[in-house]
């Protein structure tokens, strides 16, 4: 029940203009908004004029959804979100989509994780929409195979999750979205070559891949400014990202039995070479481990123009050779952030096995001054019990500070490494490190325990 201060016998909220009430109801699911119609005559039809609809019909009768939409009287929809199943509901789902399009929805979000239905294809009218500016599709059942010309002439943000689409289908989508600025492809399958050379307005690209959703293996994006590429067993070739200024990488290259020095040079380090104009770079733990192998194999690193570098890693010995060499080849670095998140890593056993097979002495590779740092299993154990020593973190910081000459600021975001006493000890050590290296050193606690899978909210 809505309560509030009374104004001449009328509650304060009910006295607000319709536009404000619509804004309030836009922030709740439509089912909850409809319930406000029972409050009073004033509220009876307010929900039906709200320009934002959020419908969850996974358990609802399709007829009740149709009835709800029939009461809707706003001339235009700013946002339409549909969370549904597809089994025995395809006609109803298509009807909802047609309703949103006919009301010129600017933001359209469709979510369905119903794996009982395979190969669902959107109707042709879905691909002809001049109003939508933001489109989000999350479904393990959707095959994006437009059988007609795509015309999304106002679309600026496109996010596809768990969808299947071919290279041919993707070209149709891109050619029909001339104003596209932001593209997210999260665990999408079958497309292999992502050619964005004709998408002149595209500035931001985010791709998450996995063992089951491999693509793409090639990216051509000369107009791109910001790239986030995460998690894959297959390497991804950056053919043209010449306008890139910001990148976030953590690529898992899979079975080390197939990894050679040539592979490292032509994939891991070559990816760095394509980032030579990037000024803001984030690198994850497994990518750092692969850089360590490249460094130990004597693979030359490119010189980078990075000014702000973020490392998302546990404090383990197997990332140190890669980090220190990377720092030496980043002469203009001004700010280094170390975020000690828990993340996936290649085991020490596999790394050492790789070194032996390539006639490299593991004791020499993990230098004596790096041997004080733990392996991945030891670090995970420390994270669980929070008994890492403050001097271990300080040694890690000192090791990195000695590898860079131009640094102005180091920020350490700690997750679960130290208890309260250890944290206070580290703060004191950081003051000494700051003075000795003429670098501003900041120590902060972080409550993000795992590497994020998405960009920060825009």
UniProtKB/Swiss-Prot annotation:
Alphabetically ordered keywords of this record: Leucine-rich repeat, Repeat
LRR repeats mapped onto the chain: 57-84, 86-112, 133-161, 162-187, 226-251, 260-285, 325-353, 389-414
Pfam families the record matches: F-box, LRR_At1g61320_AtMIF1
InterPro entries to which the protein is assigned, alphabetical: F-box-like_dom_sf (IPR036047), F-box_AtFBL13-like (IPR053781), F-box_dom (IPR001810), F-box_plant (IPR044997), LRR_At1g61320_AtMIF1 (IPR055357), LRR_dom_sf (IPR032675)
Covalent S-S links between cysteines: none
Keyword Repeat in annotation: yes
Keyword Repeat recorded: yes
Domain of life: Eukaryota
Domain annotation F-box: ranges: 10-56
Protein name: F-box/LRR-repeat protein At5g02910
Organism: Arabidopsis thaliana
